[in-house]
């Protein structure tokens, strides 16, 4: 394994000797960081199931503001510390269960990596816990790596998911929906109203039009008719 880009590009990293620990390959790591490359510099990063620390160290190399490595395995913690030798940056290595870490603090993170052992059943639990604990910053992304054979099926409607399949490995980029409320009487609905909504949809994942009724003004259209036009 090596660091793909940034200050420490090309630096070799030690791989785990434990077959149960499955480090992200350089090819997959490069693809992932091509997708999130504009989100890393200055980001606060939480690397859950950190293993060798390769993902978090890649973030340090690319200018992340802070990286917190979390793994409950003593051997993984030792490996992360070994790979961090010679790496300068603002980082912490935490030997603990991911749920305890998510529930105990209040710091928010721009990027949260979730890369548990395949078929452990911990991945979706960690994604949901990261969302429910409010540890994901506004506009932040959860990067969830898992087996292609076990696809991530979202059970909530407040997130958007971008999926990248790479053979036996799939990576989902999960973030909260960006929503907006556009309130007005819309009586009548104008081309200007439609243009504003169209522009908002370029920025937000979901736009809600709130139709108001002015009791002091005679309506041209009923609220139901305005809703149908919109």
Question: For the regions a protein language model found, what residue spans apply to each?
Answer:
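Class I S-adenosyl-L-methionine-dependent methyltransferase catalytic core
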Residues: 1-177
